[in-house]
A protein has these predicted regions:
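Formylglycine-dependent sulfatase
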Residues: 1-307
Length: 307
C-alpha cells in the first residue's frame, strides 16, 4: 500500500452531538463519513479542555507526559519536538496546517517551532474560510504524501448567529439540551444555537470531502474527523465524565477504515498519531502512549485499552 495522505479534521467542543450518534443535530457530511468509513462509538479525549486534549491528539501522549496541563494562552506549553509533523516529516510527508490547533499562544500563523512545512491562510478557525482554503490546497496538493491538520472554531462559544439563507435558525421548542442540564427555554435556545453552529461546521467538512473527490485524492487519503472534548456547557466540558470526555470520532480511508463499520471498543484520541504512523510506515516514537487502531478495525485484536 502506498503511503496515504492523512487529514485530521477537528472541531472545538462538539462532544458526540452529531448525527451518527443518534442526536438530532443534522451533520450529513459526518454521517457520510460514518457510512463510508468507521464510526467509533466509545471514543474519548485525553482531557476535557482544549489545549491539553489537542496536544494529546497531536503527540499521541497524555497531557501529563507531553507537558500541556492547561490552556496554551495561559502559559502552558507542550514539547513540540513530539508533534506528529516531525515524525511524519521524517517519513517523507509534506505537512500543512489550516485553522486552529490551540497549542501555542494566539497569534497569526503558526509559530516556527510547530514545524509545519506550510500554513494555509484562513480567518483563524472560521469554517467559512477554512473550507475554501483547504479545498484550494487539495486542488494543487503536493506530489509527495501529505499530512493536513484543519481545525475549526465552530461549536465553540460564542455561537455565531444563524444565516437564514444558508443555515436556518433552529426552533428551540424542538431542541432539548444535553444531560444533565435542566430543560428550560434558556437551555433550549442555547441548544438551538449550537445546532445551527454544527451545521456550519459540517458544511466545511463537506467542502473538504468534495474537494478530495474532485481532486482524485479520496481513495488514498485517511480522513480522521473528531472533536477535542465535550460541549462548552455547565457540567460538560472541564469535567472528567462522559459529558466532558466523550467525542465523536470517524475515520475513513485505506488500511481497513471503510465499509460503514461500527466499533464499540474503547479508543482514545491519543491513538490517532500511532495509527497515522502505522499506515504511513513511520516508526512510532517511544514516547507515544496511544496504540494504532488498525488492528482493532481489522479484527486482529478484540480491544486496545484496559484502562
Amino acid at each position: 500500500m502506498p503511503q496515504p495522505n492523512i487529514i485530521f479534521l477537528h472541531s472545538h467542543n462538539t462532544g458526540r452531538y452529531v448525527q451518527p450518534y443518534g442526536h438530532y443535530v443534522p451533520t450529513p457530511a459526518i454521517q457520510r463519513l460514518a457510512e463510508e468509513g468507521v464510526l467509533f462509538r466509545n471514543a474519548f479525549a485525553a482531557a476535557p479542555t482544549c489545549s491539553p486534549s489537542r496536544a494529546s491528539f497531536l503527540t499521541g501522549q497524555y497531557p501529563h507526559n507531553c507537558g500541556m496541563l492547561g490552556l496554551a494562552h495561559r502559559g502552558w506549553r507542550m514539547d513540540h519536538s513530539h508533534h506528529v509533523v516531525h515524525t511524519l516529516g521524517d517519513a517523507g510527508y509534506f505537512t500543512a496546517l489550516c485553522g486552529i490547533e490551540h497549542t501555542i499562544p494566539f497569534k497569526s500563523g503558526a509559530h516556527p517551532y510547530e514545524g509545519y512545512d506550510h500554513v494555509i491562510e484562513s480567518q483563524g478557525g472560521k469554517a467559512v474560510s477554512v473550507g475554501p482554503a483547504v479545498s484550494e490546497f487539495l486542488k494543487g496538493a503536493p506530489k509527495q504524501p501529505f499530512f493536513l491538520s484543519a481545525g475549526l472554531n465552530e461549536t465553540h462559544r460564542q455561537y455565531p448567529p444563524a444565516e437564514p439563507d444558508k443555515y436556518p435558525a433552529e426552533d428551540p421548542r424542538f431542541c432539548a439540551p444535553p444531560r444533565p442540564l435542566p430543560n428550560t427555554p434558556v437551555t433550549r435556545q442555547d441548544m438551538a444555537d449550537f445546532k445551527a453552529c454544527a451545521r456550519i461546521m459540517d458544511n466545511c467538512w463537506a467542502q473538504i470531502l468534495d474537494a478530495l473527490d474532485e481532486s482524485g485524492l479520496a481513495e488514498n487519503t485517511l480522513v480522521c474527523c473528531f472533536s477535542d472534548h465535550g460541549l462548552q456547557w455547565p457540567l460538560n466540558m472541564c469535567n472528567l465524565t462522559d459529558h466532558g470526555l466523550a467525542v465523536y470520532m470517524v475515520v475513513r480511508g485505506p488500511g481497513g477504515f471503510e465499509g460503514g463499520k461500527v466499533v464499540d471498543e474503547m479508543v482514545s484520541l491519543i491513538d490517532l498519531v500511532p495509527t497515522a504512523c502505522d499506515l504511513a510506515g513511520a516508526n512510532i516514537p517511544d514516547w507515544v502512549d496511544g496504540v494504532s487502531i488498525r488492528p482493532l478495525v481489522n479484527g486482529e485484536v478484540e480491544s486496545l485499552h484496559e484502562e
